[in-house]
Swiss-Prot record:
Gene Ontology process terms (BP): protein folding
Protein topology in the membrane: Multi-pass membrane protein
GO molecular function, one term: protein-disulfide reductase activity
Cysteines engaged in disulfide bonds, as pairs: C35-C38, C94-C122
TM ranges: 9-25, 44-58, 64-81, 137-155
UniProt-recorded name of the protein: Disulfide bond formation protein B
Gene3D superfamilies noted in UniProt: DsbB-like
Lineage: superkingdom: Bacteria
Provenance organism: Cupriavidus metallidurans (strain ATCC 43123 / DSM 2839 / NBRC 102507 / CH34)
Family: Belongs to the DsbB family.
Length: 161
């Protein structure tokens, strides 16, 4: 069981970091600049990945790391859902707002601007991938990862009863 749970968390971390890798590919190879909401979704994927890796390493506090990973996922789901709603309403726009200034003033934007600096518009059209927008795919993967963490937590709780 121990090897299975390690593999479980490791796979979640790999998928999470792969999503960040896909975002960086789209940013640099496809020249799609990230908006503030995109950067916040990157934070969510990175949070899920880091907390999942900590769950692999620190077995005694695994439930804590799993819960924090779920919390990161819920935050990312809220942000991605908001961005999908913005894209569905063409009259709405987040434009250049205080959120962009706030995201770009974070230490991560200063330390790793290649990853965390926001330079795009939230409602900028992007080519669909298999018929869905990039934020919709982000929402789907955040839902999958968060639900996977939740199901694992529920199964473990049932196992210990």
């Amino acid at each position: 069981m121990q090897a299975n749970s390690r593999t479980y968390f490791l796979l979640i971390a790999i998928v999470s970091f792969a999503m960040v890798g896909a975002a960086l590919y789209m940013q640099y190879a496809e020249n799609l600049q990230p908006c503030p909401l995109c950067i916040m979704q990157r934070f969510a994927f990175i949070g899920i990945g880091i907390f999942s890796l900590l769950a692999v390493i620190a077995q005694n506090t695994r439930t804590l790391w799993q819960g924090l990973g779920m919390l990161s996922g819920v935050g990312g789901i809220a942000v991605a859902g908001y961005q999908v709603a913005l894209l569905m309403n063409p009259k709405a726009s987040c434009g250049i707002d205080p959120l962009e200034n706030w995201v770009n003033s974070l230490p991560t934007a200063k330390l790793l601007p290649q990853v965390f600096y926001s330079d795009g518009l939230c409602t900028a059209p992007t080519p669909p991938i298999l018929g869905l927008s990039i934020p919709a795919w982000s929402l789907i993967w955040l839902l999958i990862l968060t639900l996977t963490l939740a199901v694992g937590l529920i199964r473990r709780e049932k196992h210990f009863r």
